[in-house]
Amino acid sequence: YLFFEILLGSEQLRYCEIKEIYIMGKYFGTDGFRGEANKQLTVEHAFKVGRFIGWYYGAARDKSCKVVIGKDTRRSSYMFEYALVAGLTASGADVYLLHVTTTPSVAYVVRTEEDFDCGIMISASHNPYYDNGIKLINDRGEKMTEDVIAEIEAYLDGESGEVPLAYGDKIGCTVDYSAGRNRYIGYLISLATRSYKGMRVGLDCSNGSAWMIAKSVFDALGAKTYVINNHPDGFNINTDCGSTHIHVLQDFVKEKQLDVGFAFDGDADRCIAVDENGKVIDGDLFLYVCGRYMKEH
């Protein structure tokens, strides 16, 4: 049960929790604004999303604005990060960069630090490298509400006019916030109730966001970790690996005679496990195990 306690901690479950039925918009769907980079999703879109968010949570409320941004390992994630930062700071927001990190970590940082107004994750999850997306997370660590999304879409379509620029000392700043990601790693480690010493754990990081975080957690808990697909190059995210190609992990676990294995998708908000025989432990069983554990404790 402890493996699931670590991998499906409150933050991962919280982010995936459905609060309401979301109606598909022109740009934003059930999991953000997603499309092929520089086709359906462009840097102009990202810049305008940043401009609106910075104004909406800042000047429009006559207050300062703080936004945290994370990204996955796609080549295009960097240009979208720069575009978002430009838009946010131009509207007066201060931006805190977690750099390459997981979607649940962004939700965790936003929810647990009182002064963040929202979080943004740049990722297209399990999609191919040429796609990308912008996920918006509110200050409760949940998906952005439909009313805010509707206002952003109206701004993208030019229906709500321009938002004012910041000037002078009102222009926002950019902060390296790797410490936030490290705090999330510490949080995951704290969920364990005992050492994993002697356990042999396989990890398929999908050449994505989990490539550094997952190993750090299991190493700290004393497990012997065996990692595959943890050398991202900007183009190999989700390519014949990760949670959408579970056979790769199944073969790896059986070949290395491991106790258990976990496969993530590109932004590590999805995880599938296999047991020592390579049998798949899917999301339904995850929920059952977590529910049973919570009931018993």
Question: What is the meaning of each model-derived region?
Answer:
Residues 15-86, 90-91, 174-199:
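An N-terminal, well-structured beta->alpha segment
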Residues 36, 132-254:
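Gly/Ser/Thr-enriched, mixed-charge loops and adjacent short helices
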Residues 66-131, 216-274:
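N-terminal small/polar loop signature for handling phosphorylated ligands or for N-terminal nucleophile
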